A protein has these predicted regions:
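N-terminal amphipathic/basic leader segments beginning at the initiator methionine
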Residues: 8-62
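Short, compositionally biased low-complexity segments
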Residues: 24-27, 66-69, 157-159
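Gly-rich Lys/Arg/Thr-decorated short loops/hinges at beta-loop-alpha junctions or inter-strand turns
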Residues: 35-39, 70-79, 110-112
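Low-complexity, highly charged intrinsically disordered N-terminal segments
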Residues: 56-98
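Residues at the starts of beta-strands that form the adenosine-phosphate
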Residues: 10, 64-66, 140
Length: 173
């Protein structure tokens, strides 16, 4: 007989997270973000208590899920609007990491829901739409947001599930 190899579902992990305060007169730049890719993304988030760390603890607790690290850009302070050049670099790097990832069975995207750039007022929705173009309609995209994030029509249209914090301080990850 032939033994059939059962493949583990692959879940792509991506994060693009910033809370913008439009009252902050200073633009946020690329260097304000912590950027992590590949194994570094997984190693870091396995040591912290946040959304990605919570997701990884669930994935790691079962033997049949393979997390596929893509890209993480994280700046949680209430920074100013994201400068055009910084937005273009982050979105380019993030989308390139998704394009170069192996085929996946699902996407987990960690976002804040309150990001804005000089050229895109709905960066999260835009990233989800571009991610959808890359992975296709059959791959589910699940998004986590801060409890006061702004949920846009485009975000809803491009994701299969949206989950938000229920508590502040955030202890439900």
């Amino acid at each position: 007989f032939v033994r059939r190899r059962v493949l583990m579902p692959r879940i792509l992990i991506a994060e693009c997270k910033q809370e913008v305060s439009t009252f902050n007169p200073h633009l946020s730049g690329y260097d304000d973000f912590g950027i992590r890719r590949g194994k570094e993304l997984l190693d870091y988030h396995r040591t912290v208590r946040n959304e990605v760390g919570g997701a990884l603890s669930v994935f790691d607790s079962v033997s049949d899920v393979e997390p596929v690290p893509a890209y993480s850009a994280f700046f949680i302070t209430s920074g100013g609007t994201l400068a055009k050049a910084a937005w273009e670099q982050i979105e380019r790097e993030l989308l390139e990491s998704i394009k170069s990832a192996p085929a996946v069975d699902g996407v987990y995207f960690c976002m804040h829901g309150a990001m804005a750039s000089e050229t895109e007022l709905d960066p999260e929705g835009w990233l989800l739409a571009e991610t959808r173009k890359i992975v296709g309609d059959k791959v589910p995209i699940v998004v986590s947001l801060d409890l006061h994030g702004i949920l846009t029509d485009r975000m809803i249209e491009q994701s299969d599930a949206v989950v938000a914090y229920h508590t502040y301080p955030h202890v439900d990850f």
